[in-house]
Amino acid sequence: MDFRQAQRNLELIEEVAKNSQDSDEPIIDEDDLKEGKVEEEGEGTQIPSMPFSDDDDSDNNSKDTFKETPLELVDKEEAIEDKAPNDDEPVVSVEEKIATQEPEPEEQIFMNTQIQGQLDDIEQEDNLRSKLSNFKYASEESSSVQVIKRSNERKLKSKKITKPKLTKTSKRTKTNSNPSTQQTLDEIKISRSENILKLLSGKHGKVKDMINHQRNVEKKVKLVKNKNSNIITYDTYNSEEWLRIMKLILEKFPSANDMEVKQVYHYIYGEEQEQEYDNLWEASQIPLASMREEAYNEDNQIDRKIPNIPNSTQTRVEVMSLSQVMDDVSIIEESKKTTIDSEREMHIYEVPDSTDDEDSRIIRVISGSDEVASIVAESEFSTETESTSTQFFTADGNMVDGVIDLTQGSFKAVTKLFSPLKVDTLLSINKNKEKVQVAVTRTSTRFSNLGSGPVGLEETPRLAPDEAATPPTVISRSPQSTRTPQATRLPNPNITVMYEVNKCELQSSNSYQSRSSEDIRIVNQYDIDVRDSQDEYDSATEKCLIEFAVTNSATPSVQPEDVMNVISSQSVQKLRQDLKTIGLKPVRTKAKMIEALMAASQVLDTDNVDQEQTREALYDQLTSMIKQIPELVSKISRFEPITMEELVLQLIEVNPFADHIDESTIKEWADIQGITLRNN
């Protein structure tokens, strides 16, 4: 709106107000009446045309009420122009009146501010209406109509949506209601699992193939089970029982032919083709194919030769004793035995067997000759062409023929036992055969070129740890003293062990005295001829004696005082790390740390730097402690849960050192041992 037009409208309003005051009965046209009615109807929304007041108090009210005057002013201006020809007054234009009338400066400022405020309000309303016109509810009439239309549309949409749903559900109910599910399942014979698989996968063809395949497999399994149920189960007998059965058959049926005996044999041991048994014990008792070939001739006849006595050498089972297996021995077959002269210096001992109290000859190789080394190498690196089955010999040296020996069929550990003495050690012995070295240790000692005496040089007496601290004294130096070989500990460590040595190839006695003058003393030395038998050794008066004095090598190398000094000299951080490494309880003070480590040094070998070794030693100590408590052992064997408090208390009763062990370490050990622990 233009500023001039607004000012003109205001002047017209003033004129209309003056005319209304001058005339008692103002002439009102029909248009004016219509406009008045509209103003009365829209009092809430439209502002009546009121003249501006000069008072400042009425300014605020005029701002609120005067809003839509410009539209009305235009209409009134047209009405005044229409009424102008009827009046007698001369027509004066509005512009002339505005030019003639000059308002005061104060009124002019006030009018300008009021007009500008009204103009701003009008522009704001126009902008707001333009924005509201973009919405659906621009007016009350349009909004009510639109609400009705939308409600009708919603009803139509809901009707359209619900109708297809009803039709769909009705179709589904029709399909499900036609035949009952139980009848269809009974008619088609569909199992519950098959139905579930169909529902889950939806691939009916694949499911049918899978189920048919499974049914065929089950049918085959049933047929195999039925066949196996008709098969006769066979009992297993050892060789003595089988010989007893054969003897009874031949006594009761002397006219029985070999085929009948064969049928009895197959009834006991089963057919040759039926060797695949589910039971491992039955499979282990089946005779070997080689034994069956030896038992039967080419005409499928059984050797009917029966021994007269049951305790014959043919039925005797040869079993190696534990001492034969663990000792440094080698079994040499009779076909491969080589005759070695006494100059080869080989000691032969007779070790009693644990089953039949008969002696088996075991050869111990001590010499360092190349020939013996080659024999050991051949026995160690045996070729694959040799027989893989273990050979057992009787006293007569013949294999058991015609008798099923369970030991040959079920035990296939090794082909032969040979000496673990390596070729490298033999060669080193051969190089140093001119020198004799005696190690000052508690372990066994070997000699390379010393004579064949009745004493095993490996059987050096070992000292008891409790008695090793006492100093040794020489009891006997008799040249004729001999002793029997016994690998036992001496009850008294204060003994000087005397060894008889024949044919001493000693270059000088100073070499031995220089090595260890305290432990080895040359008593006497003579030139002795080599004898051919043990009797000549006993009758010989000239002997070379070497005296081996038992020393205090069993005493601990580190005294407890030294250990205490070493531990106390370490820092607190190092002590704490040692406690963590061993698996002991963490403590705060250094004195308690030293106490715990001292207790561990008395029980464990704390010299090991490796954490795994220290933990394993601690676990072994706990295991040895738990074995001393029968009640806990019985609970552990029955897998009964044990409380941590109970376990620790009982371990402390056995050994107070358990009080220093951390609970986490005990839990790890219990987990390894399979002990079930529960909280207190």
Swiss-Prot record:
One of its GO terms (molecular function) is 5'-flap endonuclease activity. Residues 60-86 have a biased composition (Basic and acidic residues). Residues 156-174 have a biased composition (Basic residues). The keyword DNA repair applies. It is found in: Nucleus. Keywords: DNA damage, DNA recombination, DNA repair, Nucleus, Phosphoprotein. The keyword ATP-binding does not apply. GO terms for biological process: DNA-templated DNA replication; double-strand break repair via break-induced replication; double-strand break repair via single-strand annealing, removal of nonhomologous ends; interstrand cross-link repair; regulation of DNA damage checkpoint; regulation of DNA double-strand break processing; regulation of meiotic DNA double-strand break formation involved in reciprocal meiotic recombination. Belongs to the SLX4 family. This is Structure-specific endonuclease subunit SLX4. It comes from Vanderwaltozyma polyspora (strain ATCC 22028 / DSM 70294 / BCRC 21397 / CBS 2163 / NBRC 10782 / NRRL Y-8283 / UCD 57-17). The lineage of its organism: Eukaryota, Fungi, Dikarya, Ascomycota, Saccharomycotina. The gene is SLX4.
